[in-house]
Amino acid sequence: MEGGEELFRVSSARLSSSNVWRNSAMDVFSRSSREADDEEALKWAALEKLPTYLRIRRGILTEEEGQSREVDITKLDLVERRNLLERLIKITDEDNEKFLLKLKERIDRVGLDLPTIEVRFEHLSVDAEARVGSRALPTVFNFTVNILEDFLNYLHILPNRKQPLPILHDVSGIIKPGRMTLLLGPPSSGKTTLLLALAGKLDKDLKVSGRVTYNGHDMNEFVAQRSSAYISQYDLHIGEMTVRETLAFSARCQGVGAKYEILAELSRREKEANIKPDPDVDIFMKAAWNEGQEANVVTDYTLKILGLEICADTIVGDEMIPGISGGQRKRLTTGEMMVGPARALFMDEISTGLDSSTTYQIVNSIRQSIHILQGTAVISLLQPAPETYDLFDDIILLSDGQIVYQGPRENVLEFFEYMGFICPERKGVADFLQEVTSRKDQEQYWARREESYKFITVREFSEAFQAFHIGRKLGDELAVPFDKSKSHPAALTTKRYGVSKKELLKACTAREYLLMKRNSFVYIFKMIQLTLMASITMTLFLRTEMHRNTTIDGAVFLGALFYALIMIMFNGFSELALSIMKLPSFYKHRDLLFFPPWAYALPTWILKIPITLVEVAIWVCMTYYVIGFEADVGRFFKQLLLLICVNQMASGLFRLMGALGRNIIVANTFGSFVLLTVLVMGGFVLSRDDVKKWWIWGYWISPMMYAQNAIAVNEFLGKSWAHVPPNSTSTETLGVSFLKSRGIFPDARWYWIGAGALIGYVFLFNFLFAVALAYLNPFGKPQAVLSEETVAERNASKRGEVIELSSLGKSSSEKGNDVRRSASSRSMSSRVGSITAADLSKRRGMILPFEPLSITFDDIRYAVDMPQEMKAQGFTEDRLELLRGVSGAFRPGVLTALMGVSGAGKTTLMDVLAGRKTGGYIDGTISISGYPKQQETFARIAGYCEQTDIHSPHVTVYESLQFSAWLRLPREVDTATRKMFIEEVMELIELIPLRDALVGLPGVNGLSTEQRKRLTVAVELVANPSIIFMDEPTSGLDARAAAIVMRTVRNTVDTGRTVVCTIHQPSIDIFDAFDELLLLKRGGEEIYVGPLGRQSSHLIKYFEGIDGVPKIKDGYNPATWMLEITSVAQEGALGNDFTELYKNSELYRRNKALIKELSVPASCSKDLYFPTKYSQSFFTQCMACFWKQHWSYWRNPPYTAVRIMFTFFIALMFGTIFWDLGSRRERQQDLLNAIGSMYIAVLFLGVQNATTVQPVIAIERTVFYRERAAGMYSAMPYAFGQVMIELPYLFLQTIIYGVIVYAMIGFEWTVAKFFWYLFFMYFTLLYFTLYGMMTVAVTPNHSIAAIISSAFYAVWNLFCGFIVPKTRMPVWWRWYYYICPISWTLYGLIASQFGDIQDRLDTNETVEQFIENFFDFKHDFVGYVALILVGISVLFLFIFAFSIKTFNFQKR
């Protein structure tokens, strides 16, 4: 049975104790108990008579008053479910185990067996392929070469140059049911790959050998993804859903597995044996194990034991929407799989961001469920505290892809003693295990003093384990195959989905409807935008201005119709972004087999139809009669129907683009390309008669062509157009002759052909959307990248050699003395603070001197305006105080820990001291070495390592440090000294092996979390600061990584700097590395400020001296103990106020005296003074910003290379579509075709540039906020660098486009005309790109920037002078024509090309006259137009720079 699968859950909510009989003062026994029992017995008897199907859907529910009634369990409401759980599990820690035992007892009583799964893996090897060294960096050059190389490899023309990268190497083992297995190993040891292999979820691109079996069955005999559950370390959720909704959706999709059958069998056997179960357990099991319920008791149970009840109805949130905390999100990821029926759980790093007590409670709940209900679990944890480690039965230790140990927890230390290594007393066993295989850390644990130490490789450990008694026993067990006949029939699932397809479609539809309600702002905004655009269009094409006398009048009407098509089509563009935003969670659910892709695709289409109806109705009702289209109700409704089809077709097309592109930049580029083809081939820009024969297929497949034909026929075959023009030579009506002149079929049936074709496209695009969802995988999978050093080191460690790594930046004599042990990105840890005295003296004499400074602060208070939500809850104060009178002193060479529970104000205090707060009210005094703190000078001598490691993604580690040092070290420091100093810092922070590694985006590519943390520290250190603040430098790291970072921090302190760290949950050895502690309690009050002492002796002595505080247990972590005894609950229980106790202590008086002493400047000292605000001159700042942007652009091929390729393809496409049209000047239509080519190119290339630059600027802006706060440069040099780097790329874009198109379209080859063509194209692309930058600079994020900019494109398009020439615009709108940038571009392009040509057209006017009469463009005005375009570019540049300088959207 999948019995209790939902019971594998977890907890953190501690509720007040009591059991069901103590829950109220009401007398439950007000009637005689016999009477109540008799009544209940009668109800049970009645229930027993029902057939099994009905019996397992009904139960006896006890009310709050103690009365019982029969209920249908599928209709329990939230309150009833909550009361039921309250009775079963009052306090999670205490009652969950009792409840599970009751459940198991009920099953055992009738002799039912629960299904169990034993997972075996034999000789499992997994290999990937990786590029090595600089070829792995994603530069524009490598990007192009790699595409060619992969293509030639595919054709077997070139050999594969990628290096094999072994991830797992010949591992074997058994995971037994009913036992908890802990998976440990340093980073990059293959933990995630092993878990994915066991869960049957390995990537298809990996080479896999060996086999994984469940109960002896191979993976192809059952559905592994549903028999087991893999819980990823990445938290991918839909931000707009609440926690409860997320879990309920998951439970609804996964179903109950075989539990329904087991429940039926249990009920049948109980009836036969005449056993009456506990009514509460009975109702819980029936409610949890019945199929197809939307609101399930399992969801409530999971929320309870995971401690998520407090945020059950809070939105999950994402980077744009505030929601639950990181720790709660992590628990939600765990809960999402636990509500399902899987019997085997593979959990990857489920404790990141959780404090140790929450982790303990969650693991303990899982353990209870695994032990009692015989589940199978493998859990990998980063930093398990000793008490959590002790919950496990078995340990698997992985290192370098090999198993070093697998077996009972009790024997693991015995194995390492057998190898000669002993775990020290004050060291967590888990931390010891992660370090003992590492080259850097192994020696300190060597216990055989009589023998000389020699590094023992992972392979040697692995071979020794085979000979160890545990290893031999494992080998013997593997030699005997699993007896398949013993496998429970319900253990392995063979059905692909958890519930029926109909039920899954209902679940997806309900969720999509919910998301549409939550995203209603987008739809309302689109309707407002459409209403606004309709108002402008109405007044521009006002019927009083619209005549029906000539074909030119027809052109204006056609312009209005074409614009309506464009507006309705582009209104669906938001679908593209909305689709891509939901893709990460979709891929997760799809791969976990929650639902088939079509069940997701169908609701996203069907539910949008009503919105389409409303949007199109708004447009048609507002514009149809006001513009003066054919006054016929039938034609009105036909236009309405047609535009509905267009909107649906466009939405389907954009969704398809999103599903094909899967990345916002690629999808935008790709989407623009398709749209361009659809529009150019639509028949308005280029008439059918002029389409080249090699492109005519494009005309016939363009949906826009069918829309254009149908909407034109609907209008021009009406009565108003049925007259013959007065001086016409033919007998054709005006409508027919106009349609013919534009290459449109003048046949009424074309309306229905067009509408039918559009409906066909609606179905086609939505079908292809579902297909793309089914078969494509997430975009940009993390690429394996190897440095040459890593390859050399891997090979050496296999042979058991020790190698020397690049000792760059050292003199030859120093290289000789300094025999470095090998270090790589994976083996970098040693005991925290393990620096020898010789090292220390060397470190203190770093190349650049600095002035040691102390910082003192007295009575610091910080408050913010009271949030509206709190005022609504009845808080009357105007301000909410977050810090209340905090005082202290931080001194050089002393490492201070800033600690407290979540919400105590640790980061707030740090931000206040560092001057990083952007709002709020600050009181109190802060002094630097006795002088009052001045923020301008302080920023020059202080470093601040933020918790979020924000760095430019496309530069290398060395370049990041170079940039920081260049801008922050004083001008006097020459280049050679600066480089030596950077090398020293890299040596200190152990970054030398990573010098050429790309930083990358967190969680996507580049550096690991721990390497990022060290880079953050190094970036601040190269500024040579005297004071460094670090916010949570070890959160999210495993024990070894945390030790590396803390050793880095300790090394920094030992150079004589003042360092302060906020820290969340330190292990014993990390806590021991600190010298002093400032402890805050919730509410921002201090409760201990002072030295820690050896092994925290001073801290322990202080707290144990307080009455009622329990003594610390031997070997217990002092940090954990201290947080437990000072918690709010503990403070209440003791009746103490720790703040008052501290303020009345001797310690407080000593601190006050120290603050007073350090607040007076030393006699020979002087206040900090710098002649300028920034270290470097304005010119140097500009050059540095330009240098960084150069590398950022060069290594960002999805932006730069794709843009150049896009331009190249567009140029070829335009050249072939408009082939030789520039030289034809017989008819007006010839000129309009050539002008159409200019119009569409300007619009598309421009909008494409503006759209793709936005995400790039948005990512760089977050880095800019950090760098500006650090005092590196002012806003102007940043804006300069950002704009200057665009110029060469724009020039390349213009040359590629200009030369190809100019030659192919056949414009006149004179130097002046060619120069003007390139000039106008260059400045047009420039102002569009600057416009994209500007919109990001004035908005908080790039989504809002995209919405705002797209609103303007629509207006610019309307007023550019192509759809409606200036001469036909009403007087009241002409002013907008003059401020529309595109109108000046078209003026320049058209007037410079055609404004001086004297050839005569078929209408007997010259080209020059036609251009002047139709557009009002004059050739001699071209020079002024050029100046206007330069002016527009300068204006946008100025707004961008001004906004970047003035607006700060980062709130702290």
Swiss-Prot record:
Gene3D superfamilies xrefs: P-loop containing nucleotide triphosphate hydrolases
Query: Would you kindly state one Gene Ontology biological process term found in this protein's UniProt entry?
Result: hormone transport
Give binding positions for ATP. 185-192, 900-907
Q: Where are the transmembrane segments?
A: 521-541, 554-574, 609-629, 640-660, 664-684, 694-714, 753-773, 1199-1219, 1239-1259, 1287-1307, 1314-1334, 1344-1364, 1375-1395, 1421-1441
Chain segments carrying region Disordered: 808-830
**Gene disruption phenotype:** Enhanced branching phenotype. Defective in strigolactone exudation from roots, and reduced symbiotic interactions with arbuscular mycorrhizal fungi (AMF).
- Give start and end of each ABC transporter domain: 152-425, 855-1107
The record's induction entry says:
Induced in roots by auxin, phosphate starvation, treatment with the synthetic strigolactone analog GR24, and colonization by the arbuscular mycorrhizal fungus Glomus intraradices.
Which tissues is this protein detected in according to the database? Expressed in root hypodermal passage cells. Expressed in stem tissues, particularly the vasculature and nodes adjacent to leaf axils.
One Gene Ontology CC term in the entry: plasma membrane
Matching entries from InterPro entries are given as: AAA+_ATPase, ABC2_TM, ABC_trans_N, ABC_transporter-like_ATP-bd, ABCG_dom, ABCG_PDR_1, ABCG_PDR_2, P-loop_NTPase
Is NAD a UniProt keyword of this protein?
no
Taken from the record, one Pfam family name reads ABC2_membrane
GO MF annotation terms: ABC-type transporter activity; ATP binding; ATP hydrolysis activity
Q: What does this protein do?
A: Cellular strigolactone (SL) transporter required for the exudation of SL from the root to the soil. The presence of SL in the vicinity of the roots is required for development of symbiotic interactions with arbuscular mycorrhizal fungi (AMF). Transports SL in the above ground tissues and is required for the control of shoot branching. SL regulates plant shoot architecture by inhibiting the outgrowth of axillary buds. Involved in the regulation of shootward and outward directional strigolactone transport in roots.
Please give the name of this protein: Pleiotropic drug resistance protein 1
